Curated annotation (Swiss-Prot):
This is Uncharacterized protein L755. Residues 85-116 are annotated as: Disordered. Belongs to the mimivirus L5 family. It comes from Acanthamoeba polyphaga mimivirus.
Length: 130
């Protein structure tokens, strides 16, 4: 299972946008880079920053250098976004059994699916949450 690393910049925890995109989550399929991620999902400051790696640490920057300034998304924004939009992936208004709750057994962890954190047997799909 892939694990996304938290990076602390100026006492705030962030995820590197490249790490988020490397998760290959369906909702981020159209995002080719961190700048596209903040545009497509309308992420506003202070929920993201630009930073450059200098002298073995990440330093907050203004984002003018596309080559060196990387996008970092606040851990709290990312986790809240995933939780708020979780039901969009697994359930729809036209759900055939009408039972689309968080306690639904098809959303439980599965020991059989080593690559997945959550495996939904109903639609045979894997979802990762970090």
């Amino acid at each position: 299972m892939d694990k996304i690393n938290k990076i602390k910049i100026n006492e705030t925890e962030y995820y590197h946008s490249d790490d988020i995109l490397a998760l290959k989550m369906k909702k981020f399929d159209k995002c080719v880079n961190g700048r596209r991620l903040i545009d497509d999902f309308n992420i506003k400051k202070p929920n993201f920053i630009y930073a450059a790696f200098k002298d073995d640490e990440w330093i907050k920057t203004d984002g003018r250098s596309r080559k060196f300034d990387k996008v970092f998304v606040k851990v709290s924004w990312f986790e809240n976004y995933i939780q708020e939009n979780d039901s969009d992936d697994d359930c729809s208004e036209n759900d055939s059994d009408g039972d689309c709750s968080e306690n639904d057994s098809d959303n439980d962890y599965s020991e059989n699916e080593s690559d997945c954190e959550l495996y939904n047997e109903k639609n045979n799909k894997c979802t990762r949450y970090y």
